[in-house]
Amino acid sequence: MTIERTFSIIKPNAVAKNVIGSIFARFESAGFKIVGTKMLHLTVEQARGFYAEHDGKPFFDGLVEFMTSGPIVVSVLESENAVQRHRDLLGATNPANALAGTLRADYADSFTENGTHGSDSVESAAREIAYFFAEGEVCPRTR
């Protein structure tokens, strides 16, 4: 099987709960290698650009407001079948539908404040990684 990369965000509500280390531990326990990570505080322009596909939808302004309300942690994760495995670990977007033991079941507060984001395809992962990480900021793990 081919090694893939996926993109992950720990959103402001989960950062505020001080569970970054717990989430990273769950990534690693699930077999992911963290090959890039950083904390940042999105500007309105960055949030609008990242979520541009949702512009015009009723929840867009609230999503931008939430995503700029505090720091986030963006990461690049690597493993076999990374995109699907990461999405399985996150759980359903709506935490009311998230299975017990998933990150959203454990750390989400609402549909918008669902604690985490994960790429939905290999193509989205590549685009999202490039949005936040410059060349050389992702370090392949060889050991």
Swiss-Prot record:
Catalytic activity: a 2'-deoxyribonucleoside 5'-diphosphate + ATP = a 2'-deoxyribonucleoside 5'-triphosphate + ADP; a ribonucleoside 5'-diphosphate + ATP = a ribonucleoside 5'-triphosphate + ADP
Top EC class of this enzyme: transferase
Cellular component terms (Gene Ontology): cytoplasm
Gene3D superfamilies hit by this protein: Nucleoside diphosphate kinase-like domain (3.30.70.141)
Alphabetical GO biological process terms: CTP biosynthetic process; GTP biosynthetic process; UTP biosynthetic process
Active-site residue list: 117 (pros-phosphohistidine intermediate)
Keywords attached to this entry: ATP-binding, Cytoplasm, Kinase, Magnesium, Metal-binding, Nucleotide metabolism, Nucleotide-binding, Phosphoprotein, Transferase
Compartments reported by the entry: Cytoplasm
SUPFAM superfamilies: Nucleoside diphosphate kinase, NDK
Cofactor section: Mg(2+)
EC number, UniProt record: 2.7.4.6
PROSITE patterns cross-referenced by the UniProt entry: NDPK, NDPK_LIKE
Molecular-function GO term, any one: nucleoside diphosphate kinase activity
Residues annotated to bind ATP: 11, 59, 87, 93, 104, 114
Alphabetized HAMAP family for the sequence: NDP_kinase (MF_00451)
Oligomer status and interactors: Homotetramer.
Family: Belongs to the NDK family.
PANTHER family: NUCLEOSIDE DIPHOSPHATE KINASE (PTHR46161), NUCLEOSIDE DIPHOSPHATE KINASE DDB_G0292928-RELATED (PTHR46161:SF3)
Function: Major role in the synthesis of nucleoside triphosphates other than ATP. The ATP gamma phosphate is transferred to the NDP beta phosphate via a ping-pong mechanism, using a phosphorylated active-site intermediate.
Name listed for the protein in its UniProt record: Nucleoside diphosphate kinase
Taxonomic placement: Bacteria, Pseudomonadati, Pseudomonadota, Gammaproteobacteria, Enterobacterales
